[in-house]
Amino acid sequence: MKPNIHPDYRPVVFHDTSVDEYFLIGSTLKTDRTIEWEDGNTYPYFTIEVSSKSHPFYTGKQRVLHKEGRVANFTRRFGQLGKGAK
């Protein structure tokens, strides 16, 4: 491998602003903002809008939408039109 071509991998604090949760995770993300973590150390800080704490798939609040097929949708909308014309 070539030396000095990979970004630095370091701990970064991610803040899910939708549920006010913080995560300390290793990342190569570059940011100028910092925050003091629970252990007393200062880490780079990055805000996110969706994480495993707020995404409906992971929280179990997912809604399942049943989509009809194109033929079923057509039949539902226009199926009665041809029956009275005979």
From Swiss-Prot:
Highest taxon above the source species: Bacteria
One of the GO BP terms on file: translation
Membrane-spanning parts: none
Cellular compartments per GO CC: ribonucleoprotein complex; ribosome
Keyword annotations from UniProtKB, A to Z: Ribonucleoprotein, Ribosomal protein
Gene3D superfamilies: Ribosomal protein L31 (4.10.830.30)
UniProt cross-references to PROSITE patterns, sorted A to Z: RIBOSOMAL_L31
InterPro entries: Ribosomal_bL28/bL31-like_sf (IPR034704), Ribosomal_bL31 (IPR002150), Ribosomal_bL31_B (IPR027493), Ribosomal_bL31_sf (IPR042105)
Coiled coil start-end: none
UniProt GO molecular function: structural constituent of ribosome
Ribosomal protein as UniProt keyword: yes
Family to which the UniProt record says this protein belongs: Belongs to the bacterial ribosomal protein bL31 family. Type B subfamily.
Subunit details: Part of the 50S ribosomal subunit.
Name of the protein described by the UniProt record: Large ribosomal subunit protein bL31B
Provenance organism: Vibrio atlanticus (strain LGP32)
Name of encoding gene: rpmE2
